[in-house]
Amino acid sequence: DILADAISVRIGRDGTTEWDVDMYNNDAALTMLDYLSGSALLFPAYTYDEEGGFVAQNVRGNYTRDDEQTIPDVKTGELYLFSGGQLRFYFKDMEGANITATPIGYYTDVEGLTEAVQEAYTSNMDDTWGVDVYFWITKTLE
């Protein structure tokens, strides 16, 4: 079951492009949605992994692992929650990734997504807080 257009995301501190994200109707995704509101939340990602094709941040909360699965190939725009609480957003296709995680959601349009993340990372290299990439996240699900 899919929660269409559950959130919208702007990539980078000064990002203006709105990206729609569909989320899965599972306990982990619903718990994350509970933390969000209709106001934009500035979300920091402290890990940028060009080789792994993802940005990540550890999130707190009691997330169930009921929907955890093994995913052989990861696609651009997919979001996963790992057992240690790491939330990953993949900005590149990663064939043979073989990850075990809970699918959270996916960007509905991935055209230009890779470049947007890379540009946000490059423009944020001197961040005083050590953040690699910022995301503005707004809950759009009613």
What do the PLM-derived regions correspond to, one by one?
Residues 26-33:
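Extracytoplasmic/secreted envelope proteins and their assembly/folding machinery
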Residues 1-17:
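N-terminal low-complexity, Pro/Thr/Ser-rich intrinsically disordered segments
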Residues 12, 22-24, 134-140:
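A structural detector for beta-sheet-dominated domains
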Residues 15-22, 63, 67:
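Second-shell loop/turn segments in exported
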Residues 33, 37-142:
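Glycine-rich active-site loops that engage anionic ligands at enzyme catalytic sites
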Residues 18-25, 102-108:
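Short amphipathic beta-strand/extended segments with alternating polar/hydrophobic composition
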Residues 14, 24-26, 48:
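Histidine- and/or cysteine-centered catalytic micro-motif in compact active-site loops
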